[in-house]
Amino acid sequence: TLNALQALIVLKPEAAYKMAGDFARYLRFTLDSVTADGGIGSFREEIRAVRAYADINQQQLGDRLHMVYEIPDVDFPIPLLTIQPIVENAILHGIKPKVGGGTVSLKLEELPDHWQVTVTDDGVGFGLEAVREKGSIGLENVRRRMARFSGSELRITSTVGVGTQAVLTYGKQGKNMENLSKST
């Protein structure tokens, strides 16, 4: 990212200025997430970080990366660094290696007892053996964060050559609101 920023400063100063702002927002969110009490924050904060991260990659990938957001203007407590790493995986491991690039979509749905975030990419996909070989520290960290948050889970399905879908479910009740109020 810093190398790309350095190159943009000379070639496209306006784009470099925007990328520096996106990078600063992304770093601020990441650092704040590490120090957050209980690791609980707001959905809006997480989506701001996702957008900053996607915009940085948009500068690098250009037309090869398309982002689609179906996100209503709502906010609720979530464990931090759960959506952003999923989007990061979609871009790095799904879209970047695909000839011609692809699309990453984020959709939020409100259901009676939980919120559901679906991250879908039409990238290269992966098989179970790829996860076993490479390990998946990032996904394991997301699962661990979500396990501490009552009523939350992560489900991932992927097909080689077709893409990947991650469904993150966040419970609405009890412990979640208490954790958020403790962290503010």
Task: Give the ranges of each region predicted by the language model.
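Two-component histidine phosphotransfer core
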Residues: 1-155, 165-167
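C-terminal end segment of the histidine kinase catalytic
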Residues: 162, 167-184
